[in-house]
Amino acid sequence: AEVAMKGNWVISSVSYPGSDYIKVSSFEIADSQCFVGSTWKFVSNNNKGEMALTKTGCPAFSSPLTWYVNKEGNFVMKVLDAGEKAKRVREGYVLKVANQTENSFQLVDRITVGNSMADVVYQFQKTN
């Protein structure tokens, strides 16, 4: 799974299957919809990468990151410049990988909304 993720990607959509829009701060950085249009680069041989938010009206944010696919097949990511407030920088975020093809894949974050669980689906499209 890791080799297929190397390269440059853009998040083409962020959706909430089975739910309406959910106000969620993705990775303690910005509202999930601010990630639409964001650019991501994954380097597979050293498990490093970088990401940048590009959407107008959203915080300007870019950061190096580290990532790998664990033995359960989940994507583990740490956004290194998310600052002290992002206490999960140390252990990272674990997201499910879904619908992986040569040119696209999804990362699915399971979040708690009130008393129930919801999915946030980040749709990645290859840009080169």
Predicted feature descriptions by range:
Residues 1-63, 71-128:
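Lipid interaction determinants
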Residues 67:
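Extra-cytoplasmic beta-strand recognition segments
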